[in-house]
């Protein structure tokens, strides 16, 4: 078979040729999978992932209304996304106007699908129901019942879905919703309760809630999503549940109230006067200023360290710019910083940050500053490379400066966060330098000379953190200088000045009672001194000005800019992730074994235990030749095609099915170490997967996902340019992929770089797919790979959780990191950014051959994370707009840096900063973009966070608090108190309560009991293996660590009292015993 993906290319591909190549290869793969499906050996006879070339096709496939794609395309040429959404809703309502309920339902779902680009599952599952109810006066009203998956749509889309409901209501002539006072009070109580148990991004005031509910022309309703019920306002006629309605709370609070300003723009332009009440809602201000915030410190987790308290000296210094692996919410750090920070920060790790958003994934950039550290020998040095960091790691006693964090302008634009003052850096300083002067190699003397001669600011390498010290410290430093002396091209200053010099960021070596400063001249000049004939002389008398910085400007007679006016607080969020997706427990086949497979769900055990026959609820087929009924689409007795007869609880002859599978595959089941199924099928029809697929997965050691595919999960990180050497491919392979052979290439938007771990897994999956094609379908193999490297050029499907639309990607290489490098457009097409999000890939042929929507769970959220539609090509106009805010300049202009000094709104500079959106508008392409900082190697940095390598929680906590003590910008006592109050105490209190209301579990068949059976035996399988589900160990697991921290750290008195009370209660409840409770087996009436 000739396959396109192996065709050698010699020419460099342009964007159009690249897109055609992707489309052709997808079609080739689709055709082969269709050929296999048509053999009738699957649960459907066609490939179940429809291909979509654009958003309009995705929406048509997702919602299932034929003919709307063309209308969406036409409207999109002349309207904004939101306007298209509202207009299409009107049109769809008119199509179904004879049935008002159906018209409302279809119109609202289509409108929401347009707002979410046809990628999210929210239009299908986020709206549980659309209904027509009755007001007290007998008139009709429209109610929209929201479910949990609406969260994924985002606040604006949530709010606009209510607006769409109102527009359609008017179109159909239905009157408005009129709530009663009691219903309004129910909303207030319910929202406050939801915030307590789940936490809302924005909790409106009772008056704001009342205003929205009273004035909204549409009833914002929801399913009872939480276990907790409201205590008052129960059993109401028009509210179907007493449970808290999560979907309603999200739409009202994070949608209508929080996004009130945005919604008003649309209501005003459409003259919807009934929505003018939103103008009196303050909501949550969209204008974020540059102010100190400790929000990122909330909910600290034990073992995940804090790297800097909010805006604290010594914390990360904000540096504006974009590396080739940052932007789209990802931030870059010097690899040395990753290592020095206890190796907790790895490439792909998530850090929670103070600004501009909530979090960022970390990527490497070795052309920005690393940390400055104090060593055991008294030296104070800056470390700018990871090799030096490894060499000095054990000698570090204090991390006095965390180094720089590189954050792109585009992230401030996306978050609408006013630009904090930039650090004074070399790229800013260079723009003051007169034309023709070389500013690359500037020593300490030349730096001062240039400032004096051209009246430009002092070079940032010799500009210190004057804003971090007090007048008293400045004056102490001056007195120390008076007692210093020049010696061998260095300046010796008394050791007593070390604390001030550390705060200033001055590097030195210790020599006895003196500190040796090699770069001394700019410091002396800054303090009002100069050197004449190897002697230091004061040239300007000391005089205090309004600030220390202004004082050194006066004393030096040159301009000295604030070196690091903005520090960024941060802590570790989620560690990086790269691992194959396994259901819990691991499953090879979506085939039911009920309880006969015991806790391991073993299909082979179920066969032995039942002599091959047992009852299960499953979808059955009847053979068209011999009439035999089984869960297989082909007859396991005679091999003929079977026709579906429906779901029933009936006998499965597993032994017959397995024998037929052995014959068909040419495999003996004795060869399998393990072969696992599922206890029950969760789909609506209870359709079982052909068991042969599971056998082949078991042979290749891979697991199946709920939809029949094999996935690999990874943290998302961006890349816009790559070096072929760093991704493990040759020049020849680079050329074959359609790239020009050069050092750095701009990556195509659908090309992806996967971790080595993913390559190994996908290689195994490719072997499974080839076996499946040859042994099961009787077709030629598709992949025929000899090594993992042969994956290069093959296609994958990228799919994010909470979405229902996959995106085609092409593997072009491999990385050593545990994260997923891809173009910002690729991540955005999946509705993801790079703030710590993760998603998955699967081989394209795996998706086409093995995915079936009939396997998906029927529960709410069952359609999430399933490729219900596939985007073959990426269109920048149809992806999440965050990717269009990525900036593309080679250097930020002077006007930008000066704008940061007045904390300008980022939107003022959008045209200047050439975002992707502006580039497309001005040049009609997003290609030929650039970046401001290079990264020598995208694999250079910590590859695995020490959070994952430290063996025990005690080790993690010890390292977390040890690091807190070493970092100057961290308050270790505060970290200790927060760990106890946000993690340890809630955990112990919660497990203590649950211990006394727990279930009991049979370890053989997993049956659970609210009360222990009087016999002490499992009533289902007869086993005496009953055990607790929550053990004493779960209650006391953090107690010793908590008491230890209480002694070692200065924590608040009230917290100490809480700890002592809980410790006393636990010790009284669980006195020391000879045997731990986990070893005790419950038998007979021992429990009582």
From Swiss-Prot:
It comes from Thermoplasma volcanium (strain ATCC 51530 / DSM 4299 / JCM 9571 / NBRC 15438 / GSS1). Keywords: DNA replication, DNA-binding, DNA-directed DNA polymerase, Exonuclease, Hydrolase, Multifunctional enzyme, Nuclease, Nucleotidyltransferase, Transferase. PANTHER family: DNA POLYMERASE II LARGE SUBUNIT (PTHR42210:SF1). One of its GO terms (molecular function) is single-stranded DNA 3'-5' DNA exonuclease activity. Heterodimer of a large subunit and a small subunit. InterPro entries: PolC_DP2, PolC_DP2_cat_dom, PolC_DP2_central_dom, PolC_DP2_N. The gene is polC. Belongs to the archaeal DNA polymerase II family. Possesses two activities: a DNA synthesis (polymerase) and an exonucleolytic activity that degrades single-stranded DNA in the 3'- to 5'-direction. Has a template-primer preference which is characteristic of a replicative DNA polymerase. This is DNA polymerase II large subunit. NCBIfam families: polC (TIGR00354), PRK04023.1 (NF003103). One of its GO terms (biological process) is DNA catabolic process. Signal peptide: none annotated. It comes from the Archaea. It catalyses: DNA(n) + a 2'-deoxyribonucleoside 5'-triphosphate = DNA(n+1) + diphosphate; Exonucleolytic cleavage in the 3'- to 5'-direction to yield nucleoside 5'-phosphates. Its EC number is 2.7.7.7, 3.1.11.1.
């Amino acid at each position: 078979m000739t396959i396109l993906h192996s065709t050698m290319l010699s020419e460099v591909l342009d964007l159009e040729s690249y897109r055609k190549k992707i489309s052709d290869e997808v079609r080739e793969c689709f055709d082969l999978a269709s050929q296999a499906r048509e053999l009738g050996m699957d649960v459907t006879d066609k490939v179940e992932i429809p291909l979509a070339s654009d958003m309009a096709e995705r929406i048509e496939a997702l919602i299932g209304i034929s003919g709307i794609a063309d209308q969406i395309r036409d409207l999109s040429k002349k309207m904004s996304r939101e306007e298209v959404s509202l207009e299409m809703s009107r049109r769809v309502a008119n199509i179904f106007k004879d049935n008002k309920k159906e018209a409302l339902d279809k119109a609202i779902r289509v409108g929401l699908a347009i707002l979410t680009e046809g990628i999210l599952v929210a239009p299908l599952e986020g709206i549980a129901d659309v209904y027509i109810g009755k007001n007290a006066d007998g008139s009709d009203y429209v109610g929209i019942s929201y479910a949990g998956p609406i969260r994924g749509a985002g606040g604006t889309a949530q709010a606009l879905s209510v607006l769409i409901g109102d527009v359609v209501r008017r179109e159909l002539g239905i009157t408005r919703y009129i709530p009663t006072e009691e219903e309004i009070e129910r909303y207030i109580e319910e929202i406050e309760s939801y915030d307590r148990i789940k936490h809302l991004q924005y909790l409106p005031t009772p008056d704001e809630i009342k205003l929205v509910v009273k004035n909204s022309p549409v009833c914002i309703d929801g399913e009872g999503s939480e276990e907790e019920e409201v205590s008052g306002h129960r059993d109401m006629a028009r509210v179907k549940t007493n449970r808290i309605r999560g979907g309603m709370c999200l739409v009202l609070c994070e949608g209508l109230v929080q996004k009130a300003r945005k919604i008003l723009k649309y209501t005003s332009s459409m003259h919807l006067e009934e929505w003018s009440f939103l103008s009196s809602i303050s909501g949550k201000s969209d204008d974020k200023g540059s102010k100190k915030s400790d929000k990122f410190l909330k909910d600290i987790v034990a073992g995940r360290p804090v790297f800097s308290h909010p805006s604290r000296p010594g914390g990360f210094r904000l540096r504006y710019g974009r590396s080739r692996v940052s932007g789209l919410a990802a931030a870059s750090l010097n690899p040395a910083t990753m290592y020095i920070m206890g190796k907790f920060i790895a490439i792909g790790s998530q850090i929670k940050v103070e600004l501009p958003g909530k979090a960022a994934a970390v990527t490497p950039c070795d052309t920005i500053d690393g940390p400055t550290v104090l060593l055991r020998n008294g030296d104070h040095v800056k470390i700018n490379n990871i090799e030096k960091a490894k060499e000095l790691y054990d000698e570090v006693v204090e991390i006095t400066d965390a180094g720089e964090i590189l954050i792109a302008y585009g992230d401030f634009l996306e978050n609408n966060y006013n630009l904090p003052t930039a650090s004074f850096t070399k790229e800013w300083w260079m723009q003051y330098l007169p034309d023709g002067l070389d500013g690359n190699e500037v020593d300490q003397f030349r730096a001062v000379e240039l400032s004096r001669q051209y009246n430009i600011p002092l070079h940032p390498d010799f500009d210190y953190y004057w804003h971090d010290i007090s007048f008293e410290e400045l004056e102490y430093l001056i007195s120390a200088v008076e007692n210093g002396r020049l010696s061998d091209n260095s300046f010796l200053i008394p050791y007593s000045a070390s604390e001030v010099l550390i705060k200033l960021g001055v590097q030195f070596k210790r020599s006895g009672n003196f500190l040796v400063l090699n770069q001394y001249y700019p410091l002396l000049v800054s303090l009002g001194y100069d050197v004449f004939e190897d002697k230091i002389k004061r040239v300007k008398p000391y005089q205090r000005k309004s600030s220390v910085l202004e004082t050194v400007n006066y004393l030096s007679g040159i301009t000295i800019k604030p070196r690091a006016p903005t520090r960024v607080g941060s802590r570790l969020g989620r560690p990086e992730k790269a691992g194959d997706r396994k259901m819990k427990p691991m499953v090879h086949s979506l085939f039911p074994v009920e309880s006969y497979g015991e806790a391991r769900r073993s299909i082979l055990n179920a066969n032995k235990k039942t002599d091959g026959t047992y009852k299960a609820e499953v979808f059955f087929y009847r053979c068209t030749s011999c009439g035999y009924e089984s869960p297989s689409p082909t007859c396991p007795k005679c091999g003929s095609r079977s026709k579906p007869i429906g779901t029933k609880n009936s006998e499965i002859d597993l032994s017959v099915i397995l024998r037929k599978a052995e014959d068909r595959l040419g495999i003996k089941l004795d060869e399998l170490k393990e072969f696992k199924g599922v206890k029950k099928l969760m789909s609506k029809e209870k359709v079982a997967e052909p068991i042969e697929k599971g056998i082949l997965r078991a042979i290749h050691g891979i697991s199946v996902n709920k939809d029949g595919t094999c996935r690999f999960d990874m943290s998302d990180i961006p890349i816009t340019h790559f070096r072929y050497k760093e991704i493990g491919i040759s020049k020849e392979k680079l050329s074959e992929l359609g790239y020009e052979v050069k050092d750095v290439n701009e990556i195509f938007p659908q090309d992806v770089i996967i971790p080595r771990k993913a390559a190994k897994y996908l290689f195994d999956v490719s072997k499974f797919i080839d076996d499946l094609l040859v042994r099961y379908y009787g077709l030629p193999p598709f992949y025929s790979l000899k090594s993992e490297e042969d994956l290069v050029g093959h296609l994958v499907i990228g799919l994010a959780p909470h979405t229902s639309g996959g995106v085609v990607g092409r593997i072009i290489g491999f990385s050593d990191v545990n994260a997923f490098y891809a173009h910002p457009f690729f991540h955005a097409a999946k509705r993801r950014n790079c703030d710590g999000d993760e998603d998955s890939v699967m081989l394209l042929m795996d998706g086409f051959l093995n995915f079936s929507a009939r396997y998906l769970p029927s529960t709410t959220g069952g359609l999430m994370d399933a490729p219900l539609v596939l985007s073959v090509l990426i269109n920048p106009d149809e992806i999440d707009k965050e990717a269009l805010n990525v900036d593309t300049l080679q250097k930020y202009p002077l006007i930008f840096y000066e704008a940061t000094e007045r904390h300008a709104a980022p939107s003022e500079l959008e045209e200047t900063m050439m975002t992707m959106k502006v580039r497309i508008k001005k040049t009609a392409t997003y290609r030929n973009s650039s970046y401001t900082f290079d990264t020598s190697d995208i694999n250079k940095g910590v590859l695995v966070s020490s959070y994952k390598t430290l063996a025990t929680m005690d080790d993690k906590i010890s390292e977390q608090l040890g690091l807190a003590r070493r970092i100057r910008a961290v308050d270790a006592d505060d970290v200790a108190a927060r760990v106890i109050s946000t993690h340890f105490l809630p955990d112990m209190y919660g497990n203590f309560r649950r211990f006394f209301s727990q279930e009991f579990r049979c370890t053989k068949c997993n049956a659970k009991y609210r009360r222990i059976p009087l016999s002490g035996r499992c009533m289902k399988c007869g086993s005496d293996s009953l055990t607790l589900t929550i053990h004493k160990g779960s209650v006391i697991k953090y107690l010793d660590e908590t008491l230890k921290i209480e002694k070692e750290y200065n924590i608040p008195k009230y917290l100490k009292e809480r700890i002592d009370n809980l410790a006393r209660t636990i010790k009284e409840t669980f006195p020391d015993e000879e045997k731990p409770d986990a070893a005790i087996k419950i038998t007979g009436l021992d429990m009582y």
